[in-house]
Amino acid sequence: MKMPEKHDLLAAILAAKEQGIGAILAFAMAYLRGRYNGGAFTKTVIDATMCAIIAWFIRDLLDFAGLSSNLAYITSVFIGYIGTDSIGSLIKRFAAKKAGVEDGRNQ
């Protein structure tokens, strides 16, 4: 029995290669940062996974913002370095500023 061709699967994997590399870079940086700062293993892995998920979509966000998608790798490393706590606080401050609230940290 002959196995069917797997060209579609290979094409799908190769199409996501750039995003996968960015996610791996963000995961590695977040994991190393968390372990260096003395974080617990579980918390570090969860934070690194969330950074990888954010970094997976960074190329699309850069395109949306009109920036070069060549910045995706360094942006992924930056995402891993600052972590999800910092990203969350940046989003909260931005939303509070847009909503006209004076202090977005108390919400």
From Swiss-Prot:
Keyword terms, alphabetized: Cytolysis, Formylation, Host cell inner membrane, Host cell lysis by virus, Host cell membrane, Host membrane, Late protein, Membrane, Transmembrane, Transmembrane helix, Viral release from host cell
Pfam families hit by this protein: Phage_holin_3_1
Membrane topology (Cytoplasmic): 1-37, 92-107
Main location: host cell
Gene Ontology CC entries for this record: host cell plasma membrane; membrane
InterPro entries found in the cross-reference section: Phage_lambda_GpS_holin
Location of the protein in the cell: Host cell inner membrane
S-S pairs: none
Coiled coil regions in record: none
Transmembrane stretches, start-end: 38-58, 71-91
GO biological process: negative regulation of cytolysis; viral release from host cell by cytolysis
Effect of residue 52 to V: Lysis-defective, dimerizes but does not form cross-linkable oligomers
Membrane topology: Multi-pass membrane protein
Keyword Transmembrane helix: yes
One Gene Ontology term of the molecular function aspect: pore-forming activity
Segments in the Periplasmic topological domain: 59-70
Gene induction: Expressed in the late phase of the viral replicative cycle.
Family membership: Belongs to the lambdavirus holin family.
Domain comment as written in the entry: The C-terminus acts as a cytoplasmic regulatory region.
Protein's recorded name: Antiholin
Organism: Escherichia phage lambda
Gene: S
